[in-house]
């Protein structure tokens, strides 16, 4: 510890500046810092600031060749975390010139690249980032955004419905296409490739794209509604990914998909640019996010990954349900849902939002709800997330005792009933079950679904609390 203290003294002298006034062009970060025993919070916070901006572990003569005061990222405020021993929120301001324009990759490499393995810290978590308008404006953002998507699909005034095709792995391309067709003709808007469906021996990507598009056009002709299937173009190289997106565009389908964390921000931004230039919507899956965001005291909170996705580009992103089988604490989830959809979001610590964020008219992203949800969840989902969301039922469609199309009908009927009830001024939170029961009296498909899932609950406390 003596050695550590000797090294970190320098950091505190240079990088802890509580009188610093933040600039409108600064990128601001809130880190949850857990110092090692014996390391004061100011020193730990200053060490984080230094190591993620201009500092290194010792004084170097080349420091004299530049203006460190201009480029250093100071730690300007530290506060203890309520209810936690030896945890602090350290606020760091980064000058805009430290970052390449329009590169999420570079932003993350700087801010979280090195500092998380630091010896002086027991744990470190990036809780939030404030992206200044000057930096936001260097990004294209989502290829199209919420309003343009609704106009393309001609769907207004309700959440969109989706379904992941199951079993996720093992179907042949033709059987996969059959499942897509059954779901789409039953009344949903989208079907989805599972995130791990890329191009495996049992189903190569080109065959899947062809059969899924055939299913989509057949369902469109039958229902008179515009349909989509998220064709997952994620691949081993960026070039192969773009090749798949080009093929999707040639088929004339409306939307493709990407796994943005496993695929990487550079690939994702390339694909987002291609999608805007070629009129494709882009659905984003967050596979691998829990590796980064699940631990409360170490990693990166999902709200930061969500902001980065809005900058990199995507029209939909999976973002927790509040109900169902996957994590999500209500206020915190709604906080980052607003950060995805809205143009201006006020600081609100009760929802985990550490900074006011102004997106200066960057298009919004539709949050996607998926994971263990079924018809009984519909009133809660409609109430909590409103119209601008995609509700994705995988097992909640394909698990219907009568098959895919009736499962889809049940979900659409439940959704329309909830939207109508809400528009009539009814309280979905209180009357939800009754609304579903009433709709089930004239929809045998919904009635059967209500029987199957009436008792299912996923009762675990959320780990992500304030």
From Swiss-Prot:
One of its GO terms (biological process) is reductive pentose-phosphate cycle. The modification N6-carboxylysine is found at residue 192. Its cofactor is Mg(2+). It catalyses: 2 (2R)-3-phosphoglycerate + 2 H(+) = D-ribulose 1,5-bisphosphate + CO2 + H2O; D-ribulose 1,5-bisphosphate + O2 = 2-phosphoglycolate + (2R)-3-phosphoglycerate + 2 H(+). InterPro entries: RuBisCO, RuBisCo_large_chain_AS, RuBisCO_lsu_C, RuBisCO_lsu_C_sf, RuBisCO_lsu_fd_N, RuBisCO_lsu_N_sf, RuBisCO_lsuI. Mg(2+) binds at residues 192, 194-195. Binds 1 Mg(2+) ion per subunit. GO terms for molecular function: magnesium ion binding; monooxygenase activity; ribulose-bisphosphate carboxylase activity. It comes from the Eukaryota. It holds the Pfam family RuBisCO_large. RuBisCO catalyzes two reactions: the carboxylation of D-ribulose 1,5-bisphosphate, the primary event in carbon dioxide fixation, as well as the oxidative fragmentation of the pentose substrate in the photorespiration process. Both reactions occur simultaneously and in competition at the same active site. The basic functional RuBisCO is composed of a large chain homodimer in a 'head-to-tail' conformation. In form I RuBisCO this homodimer is arranged in a barrel-like tetramer with the small subunits forming a tetrameric 'cap' on each end of the 'barrel'. Belongs to the RuBisCO large chain family. Type I subfamily. This is Ribulose bisphosphate carboxylase large chain. It comes from Lobelia sp. The lineage of its organism: Eukaryota, Viridiplantae, Streptophyta, Embryophyta, Tracheophyta.
